[in-house]
């Protein structure tokens, strides 16, 4: 099984295991994304779950948000942006107003998704998921097939049913949100799903 190691983030293209190559901070991408999140959601605290090196966390903090990051990759956490070393960690039990999960759930095996979502409900009651969409176990955006850890390739209806089965209420679904993943939207307008959800108990 491939893990999220140094090779995954720094040499993934050459080694044919991911789309990453010398994964670095790009403020021209991360700060507009952070502003879009700030403008679309009401929250005091937020967590980027699956934050990798914490670039979105850094951007959110730059614009004044109380943002945190969690990731299962020890390499990513240990090599996070220096500005957020005190704010990025391995998964923990903290609770936040908003849980952001961008390009993460496709890495989770189908049978494990319910337990992951149950864990998310312990961490927040408001969720923003960005997920590459697929049909017949193929991503609509073929470039996403490069990543060997991309194992779940489902369409928007499948995801909505999954979320609802775990007690999450769909607030809004769309194929875009501001500048987030904008380079993919023009060539692939239905390639990514943007899901805004809350717990049914809210």
Question: Predicted regions span which residues?
Answer:
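A short acidic, helix-capping loop that chelates divalent metal ions and anchors anionic groups
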Residues: 137-143
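Conserved beta-strand signature within the Rossmann-like core of class I S-adenosyl-L-methionine
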Residues: 124-134
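Conserved N-terminal segment of class I S-adenosyl-L-methionine
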Residues: 1-100, 111-118, 134, 146-158, ...
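Short catalytic micro-motifs in class I SAM-dependent methyltransferases
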Residues: 102-107
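A structural motif corresponding to the C-terminal end of an alpha-helix
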Residues: 162, 166-168
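Conserved helix-to-beta-strand junction in the class I
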Residues: 119-123
């Amino acid at each position: 099984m491939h893990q999220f190691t140094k090779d995954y983030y720094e040499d993934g293209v050459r080694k044919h295991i991911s789309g990453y190559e010398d994964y670095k901070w790009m403020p021209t991408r991360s700060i507009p994304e952070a502003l879009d999140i700030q403008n679309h959601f009401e929250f005091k605290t937020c967590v980027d779950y699956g934050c990798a090196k914490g670039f979105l966390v850094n951007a959110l903090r730059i614009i004044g948000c109380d943002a945190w990051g969690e990731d299962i990759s020890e390499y990513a956490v240990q090599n996070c942006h220096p500005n957020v070393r005190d704010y990025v960690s391995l998964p923990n039990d903290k609770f936040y107003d908003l849980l952001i999960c961008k390009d993460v759930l496709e890495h989770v095996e189908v049978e494990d998704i319910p337990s992951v979502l149950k864990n998310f409900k312990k961490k927040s009651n408001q969720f923003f998921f960005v997920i590459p969409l697929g049909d017949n176990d193929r991503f609509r955006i073929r470039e996403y097939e490069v990543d060997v850890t991309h194992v779940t390739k489902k369409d928007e209806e499948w995801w909505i049913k999954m979320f609802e089965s775990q007690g999450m209420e769909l607030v809004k679904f769309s194929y875009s949100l501001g500048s987030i993943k904008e380079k993919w939207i023009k060539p692939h307008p239905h390639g990514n799903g943007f899901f805004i959800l809350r717990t049914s108990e809210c």
